[in-house]
Every structure is written in C-alpha cells, then in structure tokens.
C-alpha cells in the first residue's frame, strides 16, 4: 500500500538536494541554503533506511543497487570524459582515479552525484550491520547506544581524510575523502539505520500541518540566529 506522506517525503528529499546544488535557485550563502544543508542529506539517508529490507540476499541487494546508484554516476563520468580531456585539459590519470573512486570530490563537474555511490556503500554496510545486530540479539536500547557511538565516531573522523596532502607516485596528492566517501559512512549509516529501525513508526505516523508549520518557523529561526555550518560533502 502506498503511503502519501512517504511519497511526499521522498519527493521533498529530491527537491531539497536539487535546490541545494543549484546556485541559480538557492544562493550558497542564503538562509534557505543554510536551512537545507542541516537536514537534506540526513533526511535522504533516513528515508532510504525506511525502504531497506534486510531479508534480501546480499548479492541481490548489491546488484540491484549497483544498477540504480553506481551506473548513473559512471555514465555521467564517461559522458563528460571526452569534453574534459580534450577541451578542458583534465589530467587523464586524475580523471580515471576520480571516476574509480566513486567520489564527487575528485570530479567537480559531477560532484552533485556524489551521494549515489555512497548510498550503495550505505546499503551494503546497513545490510551487514543489521544482520550482525540481529544475530547477536541486540535490543532497541542497545541498538540506539551502538548507533550513537557510530555517530560520534563519524564526527570524530570527519576531518581525518579531508584536504590531507600525501605523497604517491612521486607526486603530492590532496586527499579529498576516501573512495565512495567512506570517511563519512559512520554518520550516514547512523541516519540510515535510524530510518530502518523506526520505519514502522514513520509509516504509521499522523501529521498535522499546524504543528509542521510551527516546527518549521522555530527551525528557521534557530538557523538564522546561530548560523551553523554543516554539510556532509564538505565535511563540516
């Protein structure tokens, strides 16, 4: 059975991501973009978790998600290749490594698709985590404590692989995150697992527009006052 509020949430996720990556619609320094940056990617991973089914065989899940998530990223990278290599003088080695890394930080012209390969990694990790928790009989409280520890680990690791110079092949390379954006996996996996854990509650939830409007006003007010800087892609 289709649930209207879940379809709305999925649509809003896509809209928020598009708005956040289009400077013509949302200025990077605007209040609206600051508000979107706080929750658009966490919401995306949370919603993805509500649709995750751990009873699917691991190989089937990985194959299906590769078709849905990895393939679009690779297709866009390949389509850009002739233009970037011939007319924009992009370095072939850097382009190849950037494509294989599955991370938009190494391919700035397709950076808006960075979350696709990462989401594939999140589904794989979420399957393994859920199987492990179920096998060892973790209860709700224990799961929540473990997920909170995972979130704290992710925050602690956040600057560890970002803009770090390393020497490789007689050259200095600037590390801009791990392949598949694996350095932010603990954070995204936290939201994904929370969505999976609370999926039944989320599906049964009843929403009141008055409460939603009031919450939105309070949220925007807090962002306007405190001006937090946050974003998984930029590791802040």
Regions found by a protein language model. Give the residues of each.
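Alpha-helical transmembrane segments and their immediate juxtamembrane cytosolic regions
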Residues: 1-236
């Amino acid at each position: 059975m289709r649930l209207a509020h879940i379809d709305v949430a999925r649509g809003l996720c896509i809209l928020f991501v598009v708005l956040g990556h289009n400077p013509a619609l949302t200025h990077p320094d605007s209040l609206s973009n600051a508000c979107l940056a706080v929750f658009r990617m966490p919401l995306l991973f949370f919603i993805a978790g509500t649709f995750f089914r751990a009873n699917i065989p691991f190989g089937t899940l990985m194959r299906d998600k590769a078709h849905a998530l990895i393939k679009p990223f690779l297709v866009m990278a390949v389509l850009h290749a002739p233009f970037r290599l011939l007319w924009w003088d992009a370095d072939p080695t850097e382009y190849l490594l950037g494509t294989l890394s599955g991370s938009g930080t190494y391919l700035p012209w397709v950076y808006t698709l960075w979350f696709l390969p990462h989401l594939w990694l999140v589904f794989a990790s979420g399957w393994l985590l859920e199987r492990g928790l179920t096998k060892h009989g973790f209860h709700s409280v224990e799961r929540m404590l473990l997920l909170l520890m995972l979130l704290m680990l992710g925050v602690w690791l956040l600057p560890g692989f970002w803009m770090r110079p390393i020497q490789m092949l007689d050259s200095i390379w600037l590390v801009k995150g791990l392949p598949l954006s694996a350095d932010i996996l603990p954070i995204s996996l936290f939201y994904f697992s929370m969505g999976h854990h609370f999926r039944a509650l989320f599906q049964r939830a009843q929403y009141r527009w008055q409460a939603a409007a009031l919450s939105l006003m309070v949220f925007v007010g807090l962002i306007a006052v405190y001006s937090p800087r946050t974003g998984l892609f930029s590791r802040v």
